[in-house]
């Protein structure tokens, strides 16, 4: 269920409370929620996942991404979340927004766009929807 982007990040579709324990068993120490509350009435709410994470001894951060797109502060928040070096699991409805946010964060930090595309592709995700933004960030624009 968890798709590995690199040694420090996996992404996933919406997780359940039980998935928090599975993530911990895989060595995850940080859960990043990229899904806004209320997007799917049947999905666990942010506070529920946060409580399960804290009960399991995991760190938790919410950086909700709506379908309206990504912002600079969201990219910066993802950079900050990953900067601590924790093994992280990021999730949203399908894992796509989590992957694209990671991709933008990596580009802003100077990772080559083709390497970003390769890593995302290895996990089954396509960065084409934000490739122009990735190229601009990687170029320092």
Regions found by a protein language model. Give the residues of each.
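Cys-dependent protein tyrosine phosphatase-like superfamily
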Residues: 1-89, 100-141
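Short cysteine clusters
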Residues: 92
């Amino acid at each position: 269920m968890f798709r590995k982007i690199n040694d420090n990040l996996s992404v996933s579709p919406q997780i359940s409370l039980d998935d928090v324990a599975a993530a911990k068993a895989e060595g995850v120490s940080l859960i990043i929620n990229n899904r806004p509350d209320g997007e799917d009435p049947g999905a666990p709410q942010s506070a529920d996942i946060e409580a399960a994470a804290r009960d399991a001894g995991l760190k938790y951060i919410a950086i909700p991404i709506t379908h309206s797109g990504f912002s600079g502060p969201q990219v910066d928040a993802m950079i900050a979340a990953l900067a601590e070096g924790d093994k992280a699991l990021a999730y949203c409805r399908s894992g796509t927004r989590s992957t694209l946010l990671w991709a933008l964060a990596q580009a802003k930090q100077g990772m080559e766009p083709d390497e970003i595309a390769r890593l995302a592709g290895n996990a089954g995700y396509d960065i084409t929807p934000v490739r122009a933004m990735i190229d601009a960030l990687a170029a320092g624009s």
